[in-house]
Amino acid sequence: MGYRIVDPDDVEVPDGRPCEYRSLTEAGDLDEMAMNLFRAEPGEQVPLAYHYHEQQEEAFFVLSGTLFVETPEQTYEVPEGHLFTVDPESPQRAHNPEDADESVELLAVGAPPAPDDAVAYDPGEDD
């Protein structure tokens, strides 16, 4: 058996990300899922790029604020306390719009953990 308590404030925020990002996967010693905590100020996007995953399912639980998720068909508005799920091979770009009144904080879970599974998506290529 194994148990851990992780304080996200103890997890280092790496440079080079479009918003505040804390990977909880390693700190929680997780093997079967990836877990990340994000905080995006107005005008910041959550992922490094508009993308999809070939095998990984993703789930975003909004802890505070409102998350906007752009997809090829529409932009979803996900309020605080709600969950947004993404199937494999489904392009998305989670962000906090420039005209937002507040930051958005979310917990992102992906399974299976697949650090090299993300594929950049260009919405202009669908035309």
Predicted regions and their residues:
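Short, conserved beta-strand element in jelly-roll/cupin
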Residues: 38-40, 52-71, 109-111
